[in-house]
Amino acid sequence: KALVDFYKTIMQNDPRYIIGTWDECECIKVFYNTFISAKVSLVNMIQDVAEKQGNINAEVVCDALADCDRRIMGPSYMKPGMGDGGACHPRDNIALRWMAEDLNLGYDLFDAVMLSREVQAKNMAKRLMELAEVENWYSLPIVIVGKAYKPLVPYEAGSSSMLVGHYIQKAGNTLYYYDENTNDIPPEHVLNKPAVYLLAHNPEITYGDQLGTVPGWYSGEHNVTDCDTALTVATGNGTELTFVPGSIVLDPWRKTPDLKDVQVVHYGNTRGRM
């Protein structure tokens, strides 16, 4: 507050400011620059594709994308969480990897995008397995809440949840999914004992102000206030379940509050860890 008050005496305008740790402020500065560099690289990649392909005006393509003021140019997809999913996005990036090679662009941004998606899922799986290891000889089961590629749908193609699950199963850990829309419900003996939960789905974040129009959304209140509603928000179906004492909840959306007798881990928030 003292620093803010000091700068207010010398600023001639009323700038927006963010209060954070030294590390957070430095990240804001350098990642701001990186976002610009990435944006320029993507736009100029379209220009290169136009030159190589022979029937494209890059200006027409980029002007159309510039008008996408909700998903591309707006604040959407600026919430760190689960990886990109669905049948379309990963598929198109894989196809564009072939295009980059076929047109001999000389570089492959799409490969970097898909590689980062894989490694990010693997990193999350490792964190879950670390949390699950109670003793050298015993690990808690891992339950991924949300198997479909997004909440409230039955479609599994391109699911980032299943990509995380793939690395958990590959390492030999016990894994279950909880998603009524894909007909996946863990056995009662799993739900009635401590486990590690990944809250992969959060309908409120995925759908935002359109949530009320989504079929299948439970019409009750969904404020995350205790373990019942925390899991209800993640599953999106109104099921009243509790986390058994001794369980661990990893929330990549950082919305779950402190829960009695349950360890809550906000993935991506490491303040105070050092």
Label each residue range with its predicted role.
Residues 1-274:
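Structural/interface elements that position substrates and couple domains in central-metabolism enzymes
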